Amino acid sequence: GSRCVYHAMTYGHLVGELIRRIDGRSPGRFIAEEIVRPWGLQFHIGLAASEDHRAAEMSAHEKAYDWIRQGEKTAYPHAFRNPTLSATTPNARAWRAAEVPAANGQADARSLATLYGVLACGGTVGGRQLLSADALRRATAVRFDGVDACSLAPTVFAAGYRIGAIGYGPHVAPGHFGHTGWGGSVAFADPARRLGFAFVTRRLLGFDDGVDPRRARLLDAVYAAL
């Protein structure tokens, strides 16, 4: 296509339906059996009620909603006001139980960092393969580099991954791939340093400059230690 319009829901359902049609399993079950269990990760798309006690209760600072209320300069706020997005929706049992592949994964930072660490090392670690080199190359090849038609912001996307501007300031590099999340969370791979990084939070914040100071301090410490 020639245009990009970011949407947090549809991409996962489209990819998830391919998994259902080709493999027969749901996206959550496929990921659990083919990726999560073999690699010893804590990651769920469709959280069982028996695991509820391990899930963080989400909350948000009032400023976390500023980007939804940013006015009528772009169509972006409208997309998240139909109905208005709530930071506490993930606390509901129905949301946790559902499989919304692009939006309701439940994971800890260690598991996300491990996953991206394997990808940062080319998809294979210790003789175990998560993705072939060719599959990883195709997954991270730039599909769109331009202006998002909804947010009007510069955007670079591969097959689901954001490319480049994922960390902040001195820790942004063209080869990074991963994704940011509302309120400060982020997970990405830095292939040049063979590094996987993740920061997740139960307390969503808002930032005038777009940089979460918690994430910034962690990134500074990690890169200083390399």
What residue ranges belong to the model's regions?
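Short, surface-exposed loop or secondary-structure junction motifs
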Residues: 1-171
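Short, gly/Ser/Thr-rich active-site loops of penicillin-recognizing serine hydrolases
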Residues: 121-124, 140-147, 207-226
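Short, hydrophobic/aromatic-rich segments at coil-to-beta transitions
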Residues: 171-177
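Short amphipathic alpha-helix initiation/capping segments at coil-to-helix junctions
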Residues: 105, 150, 154, 178-179, ...
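Short, surface-exposed charged micro-motifs
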Residues: 160, 186-188
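Short, well-ordered beta-strand elements
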Residues: 187, 194-204
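Short strand->helix junction
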Residues: 21, 204-205
